[in-house]
Amino acid sequence: YDNLLQLRELALKEVAMRVEKKVETQVVAEGKLYHEYLMAVIDSSEKRARRVIRKTARLATYMNAAFIVLYVQSDKEDMDRIPLANQRYLINNFNLASELGGEVVRIHSNRHIETIVDLCQERKISTVCISGPRFSLYSLFVTTFRFRHLLNRLAKLNVDLIILS
């Protein structure tokens, strides 16, 4: 019973904070004077993508910032190649991002890092949020190299990187 009360109180605080931020930013939104602009980068996985979207939306609310959700669709993730269940999860995650006030950007590219960096420059992104990279023994070297490359490219643009658990 105590857990339910705590959850209810937390939900009420979250809703109250969102309403307060919405009222505060109503005037700001007309002039597009956001100081921070967050970008959540997702893949076609259900739970990890949903978690990244929710945490980025929460961060954007705390920071009084706008956020976008980027899905970079590679050739191996073409709609005719991924299972219908994953397609459904992806659409549900896009809808979730829109419901939470984010903009969904879907780009077809096999160059994920360059796409992320280009969008950061184009949209003046201040913070990129990703889920933790998946390391396996087989792909440890390649994944580490790509991660370092992303980190270095974002550092040159003075863009922060947040790795969400």
What are these regions (language model features)?
Residues 5-31, 100-128:
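Structural beta-alpha unit
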Residues 55, 85-89, 142-148:
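Charged helix-capping and loop-helix junction motifs
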Residues 68-70, 103-108, 160-164:
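General small-molecule cofactor/ligand-binding pocket signal
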Residues 41-45, 109, 131-134, 165:
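Structural motif
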Residues 1-17, 21, 128-165:
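Gly/Ser-rich helix-loop-strand patches that form or flank binding pockets
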Residues 31-87, 94-98, 105:
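Small/aliphatic-rich secondary-structure junction motif
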